[in-house]
């Protein structure tokens, strides 16, 4: 009986160890996103996915040559956004003009992660709808 219990415990420990790596890799923020140099981009919302575990904003913005580029910005989950900023599924709608400040993917792709320090404002009114810069201005 003791041997069977010990074997079960060892099997559980091995399985937990095996899934820990992918879990940490999934949430490996610093390796992929440039926190030291917040990026500012202004664009037009195409889609807002207010879901768990991660919400997302799909938007278009002009690149340096003036061509429209599709962007993806990942946020925290719907529950966290609602608690922190009172967001709902209607907070952003297709056609809304937004300004985003936050970490861009280090590989230069049009991908941002806004689940840490970031700011989102409505471009037309300047109204800030999200700010997680912890009482400091971007880049400080």
Residue ranges and their predicted role:
Residues 105-134:
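OB-fold/S1-family single-stranded nucleic acid-binding modules
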Residues 8-22:
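Bacterial N-terminal signal peptides
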Residues 51-62:
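Short aromatic-glycine-enriched beta-strand elements
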Residues 83-100:
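Short nucleic-acid-contacting surface segments enriched for D/E, G, S/T with interspersed K/R
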Residues 67-79:
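Short, basic/aromatic beta-hairpin or loop at an interaction surface
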């Amino acid at each position: 009986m003791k041997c069977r219990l010990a074997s079960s415990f060892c099997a559980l420990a091995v399985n937990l160890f095996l899934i820990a790596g992918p879990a940490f890799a999934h949430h490996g923020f610093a390796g992929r996103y440039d926190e030291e140099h917040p990026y500012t981009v202004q664009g037009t919302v195409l889609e807002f996915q207010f879901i768990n575990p991660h919400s997302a904003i799909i938007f278009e913005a002009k690149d340096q040559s003036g061509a429209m580029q599709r962007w993806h910005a990942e946020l925290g989950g719907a529950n966290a956004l609602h608690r922190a900023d009172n967001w709902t599924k209607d907070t952003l709608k297709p056609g809304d003009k937004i300004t985003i400040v936050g970490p861009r993917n280090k590989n230069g792709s049009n991908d941002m992660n806004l689940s840490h320090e970031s700011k989102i404002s409505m471009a037309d009114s300047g109204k800030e709808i999200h700010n997680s810069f912890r009482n400091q201005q971007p880049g400080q």
